[in-house]
Regions:
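Solvent-exposed, amphipathic alpha-helical "stalk/arm" or coiled-coil-like segments used as scaffolds
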Residues: 12-27, 81-118, 123, 131-171, ...
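Secretory-pathway/luminal and periplasmic proteins that interact with or process carbohydrate-rich
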Residues: 125-133, 221, 230-237, 249-251
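Short acidic-hydrophobic surface loop/beta-edge motif
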Residues: 46-51, 264-270
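Soluble sensory domains of the PAS superfamily and closely related sensory modules
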Residues: 256-260
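Short, low-structural-confidence N-terminal segments
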Residues: 1-89, 140, 319-320, 326-485
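Well-structured core secondary-structure elements of compact alpha/beta domains
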Residues: 63-87, 150-167, 175-216, 229-250, ...
Length: 485
């Protein structure tokens, strides 16, 4: 696509992602120009959002949603209908950010020279095999070259605005060192039986006793295997491997990085429970390895800070702006992200009034009900969703889990088995369902395990066939009279 070619000649802007993901520049430019040519009142009536009175059209929004979904699929993501709501929300947010940035660039009267536009246009033309093909694409998009130049001018204005922000960012040597350093902690975790002060104190005392044993010379790995409740690390003697800053919860990270190699920590409390930590090793920012990695790490840190600065800048612009989103489902999704579940439920209900046959909208409402601990209301919505989209295994899985949450075990198992049946070739789905049924001690787990075995058998057959085909091809390519290495 043309826009993908253009991206190679422009700076990446992570905050403005909507159009970048695969949409044609000609299409996007044409949409923007056609939007301007239509009356503002007409466009506002057909818009997904208004940004300081400036409309974002439904057509542009829908094209960007489609482009973003295609991009995720190209990146190997497993896109299912339940994920589309989040893509729609992110697309609207990106288009709003884009509009805010363009409005700010115009407000600042950022100048763009004819030479700069010429350079950008030349880069586009050079990406086509011939001038004729460029003109055909231009005409097919309903654009004139003058209109395209106007669109490119706006793009350059936004790039210059973001360049000003980028140039304000500095990375210190201390930041580079901290980002490079890693520690290798081992830990023993004890989880309180419940949230009562007595249970927490009992868990703390247990960890304190273990810490005292360790200081007296007890083997850390042996105690971790015997007492740690972190199933992911206990069999490794509590060893978490090398981890950098930002990878661990705050309290654990601060304690681990404060230790010397071989030192045992005091009791550390986190949301997971109580820990005692031993530092096994430390990777310092020194030597040839650090020097080789330093420049790339500095560039990565700068990009992170730039993106954070852009996000903060856009948030400030939005605080000073009037933004109206005109889709109840997208509003509800945003409220869910903010943790305002009660308000989200009302907007999901309003959305359903206009789209009562949307199974996935019902699933979103059900998820909100579950957040409110309204399990029966969630089940009612999911039962309707399954009736509307019976072939979707994810909906059956959600319904099964809701039944289990309501202690309706037989109904839950029945729905889980339907989910398994409708996704017979989905290895991850089968593993998830098998794990649930095994934990419940249900004999139906064997049905799912048979499906897992069949998936593995088919995979091994395909792998064997591929290896044989590659072997035959290698033999055919070996010159006669020579010996393959």
């Amino acid at each position: 696509m043309l826009f993908q070619k253009l991206r190679k000649n422009t700076r990446g802007i992570l905050i403005v992602i909507a159009i970048a993901f695969g949409a044609s520049l000609f299409y996007t430019g044409a949409m923007a120009i056609m939007d301007r040519q239509r009356g503002k009142q007409e466009l506002a009536a057909n818009s997904i959002a208004l940004v300081n009175g400036e409309p974002i059209s439904w057509a542009a929004y829908q094209e960007n949603v489609y482009a973003n979904l295609r991009y995720q699929e190209m990146m190997g993501a497993r896109v299912n209908p339940l994920m589309v709501e989040a893509v729609k929300y992110n697309t609207v947010e990106s288009l709003i950010s884009q509009s805010l940035l363009l409005q700010e660039a115009k407000k600042q009267k950022i100048k763009v020279s004819r030479k700069e536009i010429d350079a950008k246009l030349s880069a586009i033309k050079e990406s086509f095999p011939s001038a004729k093909e460029f003109q055909e694409q231009l005409r097919g998009s309903g654009l004139t070259e003058a209109q395209l130049r106007g669109y490119l001018k706006e793009q350059i204005q936004v790039e210059k605005l973001l360049d000003d922000l980028r140039n304000e960012v500095r990375i210190t040597e201390e930041e580079i060192v901290k980002a490079y350093e890693e520690v290798r902690p081992a830990h023993i975790l004890v989880i309180p039986e419940d949230d009562t002060p007595e249970a927490k104190e009992q868990a703390r005392q247990k960890v304190q006793e273990l810490a005292e044993q360790l200081r007296q010379g007890a083997d850390f790995a042996e105690l971790a295997r015997a007492y740690s409740e972190d199933v992911g690390s206990k069999e490794e003697g509590g060893d978490l491997g090398f981890v950098g800053r930002g990878r661990l919860v705050k309290e654990f990270e601060e304690a681990a990085f404060a230790l010397e190699v071989g030192e045992i920590s005091d009791v550390v409390e986190t949301d997971y429970g109580f820990h005692v930590i031993k530092l096994l090793d430390r990777k310092l920012a020194e030597g040839d390895e650090f020097l080789e990695a330093r420049d790339a790490l500095a560039a990565e840190l700068k990009e992170q800070k730039v993106n954070n600065k852009i996000a903060e800048f856009v948030a400030e612009l939005r605080d000073d702006s009037q933004v109206v989103i005109r889709d109840e489902q997208i509003i509800a999704h945003g409220l869910m992200r903010e943790g305002n579940v009660d308000a989200a439920v009302e907007h999901y209900k309003a959305a359903l009034e206009g789209r009562p046959d949307d199974a996935y909208l019902r699933a979103s409402l059900a998820q909100a009900y579950l957040e409110q601990d309204k399990t029966q209301e969630a089940i009612q919505e999911l039962e309707q969703a399954v009736a509307q989209a019976d072939s979707d295994s994810q909906l059956h899985l959600m319904l099964g889990l809701a039944y289990l949450q309501a202690d309706e075990e037989d109904k839950g198992v029945e729905s889980l088995l339907r989910a398994s049946e409708k996704s017979a070739s989905d290895f991850l789905m089968q593993i998830q369902i098998s794990s649930i049924l095994q934990r419940m001690g249900r004999e139906e787990a064997s049905v799912v395990e048979d499906r897992i075995a069949e998936i593995q058998r088919l995979y091994e057959e395909q792998l064997k066939a591929l290896q044989e085909a590659e072997g035959n091809q290698a033999e055919e390519e070996t010159p006669e009279g020579s010996t393959a290495p």
